[in-house]
């Protein structure tokens, strides 16, 4: 299954690491466009310049790990498409250009199911998607989640519980399913 990952899923670290971890397990084929990756990098500027540099390094590593993930949008496609937020049309165009099965996004209102269905696409929320991946490979996804929890402990010095970390990362159902 090919899934286009929206920038809003790539930007939060825990969410990104979990979704990318599922892709590394071979549970799905990730897709993105240069524009989506650029949106992610620019969004990190709100933190500081170092965060943007870090994000750009992460982007290089992602493109190296998944060389077939990058999608080039077919010329003229965006002009025939419509979404409630015109700034998101490029995401839909990338999913169509990449022959994706779905789009993973947190922006449900900007990606109406009816419009996506007309284009042969499914909308996935990251929490729902990660729960599906957990059902497909419980051992693998548990391993990914455990590694993220260990990294959170190492980086933050805070003592996180899995469910609390996943809830903070806006993945509450996934966190509950792990317990």
Specify the residue positions occupied by each region the protein language model found:
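PIN/NYN-family metal-dependent endoribonuclease catalytic core
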Residues: 13-47
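Active-site neighborhoods of divalent-metal-dependent phosphate/nucleic-acid chemistry enzymes
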Residues: 67-102, 136, 152-157, 168-179
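Acidic, PIN/NYN-like endoribonuclease modules and their adjacent C-terminal/linker elements
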Residues: 108-179
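Short beta-strand and adjacent tight-turn residues that come in two discontinuous sequence segments
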Residues: 105
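Domain-scale selection of a single, long terminal region
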Residues: 41-74
């Amino acid at each position: 299954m090919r899934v286009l990952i929206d920038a809003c899923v790539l930007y939060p670290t825990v969410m990104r690491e979990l979704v990318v971890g599922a892709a590394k397990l071979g549970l799905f084929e990730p897709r993105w466009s240069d524009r989506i990756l650029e949106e992610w990098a620019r969004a990190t500027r709100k933190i500081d310049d170092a965060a943007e540099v870090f994000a750009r390094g992460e982007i290089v590593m992602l493109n190296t790990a998944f060389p077939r993930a990058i999608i080039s949008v077919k010329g003229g496609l965006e002009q025939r498409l419509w979404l409630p937020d015109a700034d998101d049309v490029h995401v839909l165009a990338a999913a169509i250009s990449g022959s994706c099965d779905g789009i993973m996004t947190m922006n449900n209102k900007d990606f109406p199911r009816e419009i996506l269905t007309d284009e042969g696409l499914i909308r996935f929320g990251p929490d729902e998607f990660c729960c599906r991946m957990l059902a497909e490979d419980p051992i693998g996804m548990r391993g990914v989640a455990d590694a993220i929890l260990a990294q959170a402990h190492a980086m933050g010095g805070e003592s996180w519980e899995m469910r609390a970390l996943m809830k903070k990362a806006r993945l509450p159902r996934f966190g509950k399913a792990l317990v």
